[in-house]
Amino acid sequence: MKKDIHPEYKKVVFLDTSTNFKFLSGSTKGSDETIEWEDGNTYPLIKVEISSDSHPFYTGKQKADKVGGRVDRFKKKYNLQ
């Protein structure tokens, strides 16, 4: 790798603002806000609106809309069911 062209990779705390869930991970994104983590160290705090704690795919609360495709619409239009 070339020197001095890659962003600094460091540990940060992500805060899901919709559920107040926090997790420690690595990132190149920085922040002026900091938070003290469970290990006693202070890390930059990055606020996110959606994480694996609140996203419907991971929580199992997703909606399964049954929207027909073109064939289904054609059959319905011409009463070919």
Swiss-Prot record:
Keyword vocabulary terms for this entry: Ribonucleoprotein, Ribosomal protein
Single Gene Ontology MF annotation: structural constituent of ribosome
Cited InterPro entries: Ribosomal_bL28/bL31-like_sf, Ribosomal_bL31, Ribosomal_bL31_B, Ribosomal_bL31_sf
Pfam families linked: Ribosomal_L31
Any single GO CC term annotated in Swiss-Prot or TrEMBL for this entry: ribosome
Keyword Ion transport part of the UniProt annotation: no
PROSITE patterns referenced in this protein's UniProt entry, alphabetically: RIBOSOMAL_L31
Gene Ontology biological process: translation
Organism domain of life: Bacteria
Complex and partners: Part of the 50S ribosomal subunit.
HAMAP family named among the record's database cross-references: Ribosomal_bL31_2
Family to which this protein belongs: Belongs to the bacterial ribosomal protein bL31 family. Type B subfamily.
NCBIfam families the record matches: L31, PRK01678.1
Protein known as: Large ribosomal subunit protein bL31B
Organism: Oceanobacillus iheyensis (strain DSM 14371 / CIP 107618 / JCM 11309 / KCTC 3954 / HTE831)
Gene it is expressed from: rpmE2
